[in-house]
Every structure is written in C-alpha cells, then in structure tokens.
C-alpha cells in the first residue's frame, strides 16, 4: 500500500501514549479557544448576519468527517425545493489563499481548492472562496442567492448563522476527547450540544438500517437529534468522457484505488465490499497530483474519489475513473431541516 505524507496521529484515536509536547500545548489551545468563544458569546466580538438564512456545516474535530458529500447533497436538495443556494468556503489548499474568488466547475483546483471545485461541478451552484466567510456570504447574497451554505464554518463565529449541522465520524467520534494537538478536538465535545442537527457518518454501511427518526445521544445532544448518514457508491465514471458504467462490472477484478482524503481506508473498504480487488494508494488530504503519481508499474484501472478526480482532469486518460459518492439520510431529516428553513425564510423576509 502506497503511503505518502502526514497522517492523523494514532494517539488521537487509540491508547498510544500522547507525546509530552502535545500534552503541554493542548491546555493552551483549549484556553485560547474558550476565550475566543466567550468573547463572541458576550458580544465583545461581534457577529454579523446576512439577510438570508445561513446553514453552517462543520465539525468539532479536526480532519474529514464527510462534510463535502453532505454539502453537495444539501445544496442539491435545496435546489430541488426551489431555493437558490450559494456555498461559502475557505478553499483549503489553494494557491494564494488570501484572494477571494468565484469558483465554477472549470476553475483550476490550484485557484479554487479541490472541495469548492467539486461542489461547483456537482451542483452548478454559486461558490465563493474566501478566508472571511462573512465576506463570502455577502458576495453570494449580492449575486442573487437566497440561502447560504457555509462549508466547514462551525468555528467561524464572525458569520451569524441560523442552523448548525455537526458532522461526526461514526467510528471515531471524538477520539480520546482531548483538545488539539493532544487529541482531535477543535472545541470541547460539549460544543456539539449547541448544534441544531448532528449527522453521523456511518461510511459505507451498506447493510446498516438508517432509522427514520433521530437518535438522541446522552451528554452531547444536538437540538434536533442525531441522524445517521450512509455513503453509497454504485457506478464509475471514465475520466476520458465516456459513459458511466456500473461499479458491479468491476467485481472480481483488481484495480488501483487512489484516495487523497482524510480517511482513505474508508474508500478502499467501500470498493472491497463490492467485490473489487483493491491495490490501495493513499495520498495526503488535498494532495496535488501529477501524472507520475500514477506510475504504479501495472496497467490496471485506476479508481479514485471525485475529490481526487477534479485534480486529475488535465492528464486524465482511459485508465482513470472517478467514483461518485452519494450521501443518504432519512427522509425525516430533510423534512425537519427544510421545514425549519422555510420558517427562517419567512422570518428573514419580515425583518
């Protein structure tokens, strides 16, 4: 298995001893986080709103939890319901990160960031990248958006929000429960109680049953309960522009599987569960690919996540395939969320 770049520290999620420097820095990080949060709570640092509803999707842990698939699905649902959503994102990993810009499906990933380009490509929605989420939200409103979805903005308190959706990894949860860098927490786990919805990413979970109602969790209850999200894959898209084919057509075959995401093993496991022989190649999250990265020494199909695929379009050939990922949640979750947003829209229009 190819492994390149930094990985999540093992001691975040197991019983490995925590290095002394990390143990010493964690209280400092926690204190700074608490002071900053308190300043906003007391009004000494001001929050600013926009004249449309704002939905923030984020997590209290560092690393990937499935926010991007949920963001794409939420934006698509909003479009189907008649909204004109806009997405505000930092655009992590892009060049010249301090420059705000519009992102569409054709924006180079180096300028827009892999996740914003993927969101624009999958949804066609207006996407604005800016380190200042408030400025991004204002630009989206001026562009005609009537609802803002803020991708990974839970800790960006300057932007006032109407709905917070926490996304948490169903297996790892909050790890060892310690603050960065001794553990994975950006904020104390208790912060999750203040969120309106919690979405638990079960990963593939092909045999799991998604409950029709929210499941409460002691001591970290979100306002509207906990909802389980399942990620599914059922097709592969040739990156040379040919028609998609069923994923099942690769069952029993060996493939190179590429993933430059926070938890690459999750993608590999999903392919294995479909009966595909996986030769895994894990890259760092937000890795910038070059054609030579795919010199694996054997001519097998190369399957990758869509987040990786948007970065490989300039040198794609007939051996490269993207695997579309779908986020599935209970119908009751969407009813609850969309009903709340409809009420918020009326409130904003009356303001």
Curated annotation (Swiss-Prot):
ATP binds at residues 61-68. Keywords: ATP-binding, Kinase, Lipid A biosynthesis, Lipid biosynthesis, Lipid metabolism, Nucleotide-binding, Transferase. Pathway: Glycolipid biosynthesis; lipid IV(A) biosynthesis; lipid IV(A) from (3R)-3-hydroxytetradecanoyl-[acyl-carrier-protein] and UDP-N-acetyl-alpha-D-glucosamine: step 6/6. GO terms for molecular function: ATP binding; tetraacyldisaccharide 4'-kinase activity. It catalyses: a lipid A disaccharide + ATP = a lipid IVA + ADP + H(+). It is an enzyme of class 2 (transferase). Transfers the gamma-phosphate of ATP to the 4'-position of a tetraacyldisaccharide 1-phosphate intermediate (termed DS-1-P) to form tetraacyldisaccharide 1,4'-bis-phosphate (lipid IVA). This is Tetraacyldisaccharide 4'-kinase. The gene is lpxK.
């Amino acid at each position: 298995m190819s492994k390149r770049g930094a990985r999540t520290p093992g001691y975040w999620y197991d019983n490995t001893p925590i290095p002394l420097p990390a143990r010493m820095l964690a209280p400092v990080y926690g204190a700074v986080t608490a002071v900053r949060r308190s300043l906003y709570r007391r009004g000494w640092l001001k929050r600013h709103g926009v004249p449309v509803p704002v939905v923030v999707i984020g997590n209290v842990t560092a690393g990937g939890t499935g926010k991007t698939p949920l963001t794409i699905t939420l934006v698509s649902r909003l479009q189907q319901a008649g909204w004109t959503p806009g997405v505000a994102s930092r655009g992590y990993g892009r060049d010249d990160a301090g420059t705000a810009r519009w992102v569409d499906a054709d924006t180079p990933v180096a300028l827009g960031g892999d996740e914003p380009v993927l969101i624009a490509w999958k949804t066609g929605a207006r996407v604005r990248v800016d380190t200042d989420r408030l400025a991004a939200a204002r630009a989206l409103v001026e562009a005609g958006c009537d609802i803002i979805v803020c991708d990974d903005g839970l800790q960006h308190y300057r932007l006032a929000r109407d709905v917070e959706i926490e996304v948490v990894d169903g297996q790892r949860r909050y790890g060892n429960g310690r603050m960065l860098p001794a553990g994975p927490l950006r904020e104390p786990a208790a912060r999750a109680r203040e969120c309106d919805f919690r979405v638990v990413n079960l990963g593939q979970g092909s045999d799991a049953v998604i409950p029709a109602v929210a499941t409460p969790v002691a001591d970290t209850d979100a306002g509207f309960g906990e909802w389980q999200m399942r990620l599914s894959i059922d097709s592969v898209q040739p990156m040379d522009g040919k028609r998609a084919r069923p994923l099942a057509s690769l069952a029993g075959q060996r493939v190179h599987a590429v993933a430059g995401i926070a938890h690459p093993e999750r993608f590999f496991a999903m392919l294995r569960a479909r009966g595909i022989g996986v030769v895994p190649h894990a890259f760092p999250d937000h890795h910038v690919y070059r054609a030579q990265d795919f010199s694996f020494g054997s001519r097998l199909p190369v399957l990758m996540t869509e987040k990786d695929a948007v970065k490989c379009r300039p040198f794609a050939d007939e051996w490269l395939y993207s695997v579309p990922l779908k986020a599935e949640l209970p119908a009751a979750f969407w009813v609850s969320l969309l009903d709340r947003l409809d009420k918020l829209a009326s409130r904003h229009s009356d303001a």
